[in-house]
A protein has these predicted regions:
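Glycine-rich flavin
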Residues: 1-20, 29, 36-43, 48-168
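Class I SAM-dependent methyltransferase core
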Residues: 26
Length: 168
């Protein structure tokens, strides 16, 4: 989570100052896309991620949900195959194997979002939480990063507003 430092006097001294064209905070879909494109154009880029490369999409959201949907679709086809002249059967779901499938799909995509790949593209990756210490400086992992531009790509959280009938 990105938070503004309100206790400047308590800020520890960082070990290294890194000056770049772009500092990208968040290594989900948006942050990774921007970092790769900027590096491809020869820009100096630092990418800060406090948790997992690939963000929620790769690790918890888009990719795992699509892998689960694919498994469910196969089960549905087994149940509804009569219209194609195939005797339908009730599938036996092995939850552990489905979970393994989901993990395999994540693992097959993860190298595209990895620290190693982005380092190879010329992006400096810092695995730590980032926080602004002033309007032109972010601190992360013992480093102070100054940049021409900051890209905040930390994602979002869904909010379900109360409708006073079914959600309070």
């Amino acid at each position: 989570m990105l938070k503004k430092n309100t206790e400047a006097a308590a800020t520890p001294v960082a070990s290294e100052v890194i000056d770049v064209d772009f500092c990208v905070i968040g290594a989900g879909s948006g942050g990774l896309s921007f970092a790769a494109a900027a590096a491809a154009f020869g820009q100096k880029v630092v990418l800060i991620e406090k948790h997992k490369m690939g963000g929620d999409c790769l690790n918890y959201g888009c990719v795992p949900s699509k892998a689960l949907l694919a498994a469910g679709k196969r089960a549905h086809y087994m149940r509804t195959s009569a219209k194609f002249g195939i005797v339908p059967v009730e599938p036996i779901v092995d939850a552990k194997a489905v979970h393994g499938h989901v993990q395999d799909v994540i693992a097959s995509i993860a190298p595209n979002d990895s620290v190693e790949r982005f380092t190879g593209l010329g992006v400096r990756v810092i695995t730590a939480a980032g926080r602004f210490i002033d309007k032109k400086t972010v601190e992360a992992g013992g480093h102070r990063i100054t940049a021409r531009r900051f890209i905040i790509a930390t994602g979002s959280s869904p909010v379900v507003p109360p409708d006073r009938k079914s959600v309070v």
